[in-house]
């Protein structure tokens, strides 16, 4: 039995769809809002639940009896988190703590999606060095702080867990989902609109299907700890935008790198 929390989100939906099409899994999707794709091909159960509601999430665990819980839910817009500290902490820390405690009670493996925003980005890009699972977090915004705090609480509470850090996850989004950098660039350029993108921020863009595949491996892998799932190319946001324009044969002159 697999419980996917945040199943209406971009990454969560991919994981739900993939797991629900495998015979060995009995998948339950959970989101704050009703199923975004109720007539999809996957075989799954869908529940509308607010994970910030302690009673509701306890009831969900009782009904789902999960062997593994995959938490893709988060308040993940950095600028919003900066001005809504209480809401961000409640979603990214307090609710995560509750999930961790329930996973211990039900002996569920807890797979929690986190972010590269736990780092400060000051690593020397000229050295060719990348952040590893052993790198020391040093968040510079409140979103990153809450995600790091959530990671720490999971490690303190859970005896069976995997923290999965991802970044710049891309792929095709469904209507109503938050977009990603690839879709954003395509939409703007197709509309003939200019787009400004940073050229001094290095990231490793990751295909959403690869994240799903990595999470599936971690369901069966009993190792505890932090795992980075990312693409194999490091590039700036501006370079990503230019790649999208070239691949889709769109007007790259509309892209303006900034620092």
Per-range role (PLM):
Residues 48-91:
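NAD(P)H-binding glycine-rich loop region in Rossmannoid oxidoreductase-like domains
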Residues 152-203, 210, 216:
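NAD(P)-dependent short-chain dehydrogenase/reductase
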């Amino acid at each position: 039995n697999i419980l996917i929390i945040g199943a209406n989100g971009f990454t969560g939906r991919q994981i739900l769809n993939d797991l629900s099409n495998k015979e060995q899994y009995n998948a339950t999707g959970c989101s704050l809002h009703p199923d975004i794709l109720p007539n999809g091909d996957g075989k799954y159960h869908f529940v509308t639940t607010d994970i910030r509601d302690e009673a509701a999430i306890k009831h969900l665990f009782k009904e789902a009896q999960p062997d593994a819980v995959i938490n893709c839910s988060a308040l993940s817009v950095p600028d919003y988190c900066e001005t809504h500290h209480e809401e961000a902490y409640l979603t990214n820390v307090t609710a995560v703590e509750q999930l961790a405690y329930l996973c211990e009670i039900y002996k569920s493996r807890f797979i929690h999606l986190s972010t590269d925003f736990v780092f400060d980005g000051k690593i020397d890009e000229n050295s060719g060095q990348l952040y590893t699972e052993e790198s020391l977090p040093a968040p510079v915004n409140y979103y990153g702080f809450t995600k790091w705090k959530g990671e720490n609480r999971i490690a303190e509470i859970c005896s069976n867990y995997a923290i999965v850090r991802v970044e710049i996850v891309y792929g095709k989004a469904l209507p109503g989902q938050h977009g990603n950098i690839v879709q954003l660039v395509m939409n703007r350029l197709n509309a003939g609109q200019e787009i400004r993108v940073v050229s001094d921020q290095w990231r490793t863009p990751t295909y959403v299907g690869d994240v799903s595949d990595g999470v599936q491996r971690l369901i069966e892998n009993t190792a505890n700890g932090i795992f980075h799932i990312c693409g194999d190319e490091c590039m700036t946001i501006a370079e990503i935008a230019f790649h999208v324009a070239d691949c889709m044969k769109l007007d790259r002159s509309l892209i303006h790198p900034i620092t």
